């Protein structure tokens, strides 16, 4: 976030009330994350398909889990763009005109909770991770989301390894909201949803000032074309 202030990637539009909305939703994200860490461990640990905890190295557990998670979440991300799923889970995240680090976790609480549960299913009953490994998974996933939502410029070669802010601006582009779903562009390239970009999309978010209708979005009203 400091780098965004020192060397911003582009000038972001003025969005009345944005910081208040963003801080509120980000606090909800933090609260849900902390509240569910031990809950998922209690509910989902025990029997697992694999036994990642045997590695003992929690960082490696988290990294392997994150890599597997990028594939699972690629498909879950595509599902969230389907009619019905979009309104319930994902339109809040796509509504802001400003794509910056604060936007990374600007999500409907239902989406936050569902993402948290899916990550826990990957780490516990699927991979058999320890709690420490799951926390590292969260770290890698959060770092990735903060990076590719950040308002910073990146060299094009980075796109061969990880999603960049330029690539992800296409995903949030006004009247597009498609392409570049994955943390790893590998999955988008393999499944035909990759769109290359070395500059930022001109406009992102919802038309007019519809992003300000946060209350209606939280109540599952589709506000995109209002």
Describe each region flagged by the PLM.
Residues 1-2, 34, 65-78, 144, ...:
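Hydrophobic alpha-helical membrane-embedded segments
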Residues 1-22, 37-54, 199-203:
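Membrane-helix interface linkers and caps
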Residues 3, 86, 95-106, 127-130, ...:
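Cytosolic/stromal cytosol-facing helical appendages immediately following the last transmembrane segment
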Residues 6, 72-75, 79-83, 92, ...:
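Active-site His/Glu-centered metal-binding helix of metallohydrolases
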Residues 10-32, 95-107:
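Juxtamembrane helix-capping/reentrant segments at transmembrane boundaries
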Residues 29-37, 109-123:
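Core segments of transmembrane alpha-helices
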Residues 52-78, 134-135:
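Membrane-embedded alpha-helical segments that form the functional core of polytopic membrane enzymes
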